[in-house]
């Protein structure tokens, strides 16, 4: 299969970088900041959620009224030092990228993590040189699609 593969698209968090646990911990930290101590079950429930699911859970379970953008902004602020400190690769991820690149396969990241944080994480993990393109959801502009990729060099 690698002989015919021309490109490979990867998610960043949880696929190349072992960062999902830290992202999911933000859910519990957020409600604790509001003075709420989640039960073990609630903590476990939140560890399995991301995005808009957890915002709905905050409303129904804790009566916390927040929106997705506000939650994302707080989580990204808290994750910057995590990425800056270096998030480890998932086992085998860096070696697999290198094997693909050695065979001429274009390697691409598509991530919901904002571009600035993604670049911090990928640079600290020394993965940028093995990527051809990086796409992040915050790069998408409904009016203009002219700047969709972040250069990797």
Question: What name fits each language-model region?
Answer:
Residues 2-103, 116:
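N-terminal helical cap/lid subdomain that shapes the substrate entry/recognition surface
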Residues 4, 127-130:
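Short loop/turn motifs at secondary-structure junctions
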Residues 9-11, 108, 135:
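Conserved beta-strand segments that form the floor/walls of ligand-binding pockets within enzyme
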Residues 15, 111-113, 149:
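Conserved phosphate-coupling serine/threonine residues in phosphotransfer and NTP-handling enzymes
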Residues 42-46, 130-143:
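A short, structured active-site edge motif that brings together acidic residues
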Residues 77, 123-126:
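Conserved ABC ATPase "signature" region
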Residues 96-122, 137:
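Substrate-recognition element of Asp-dependent hydrolases with the DxDx(T/V) motif
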Residues 146-152:
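Conserved small/polar residues in nucleotide/adenosyl-binding loops
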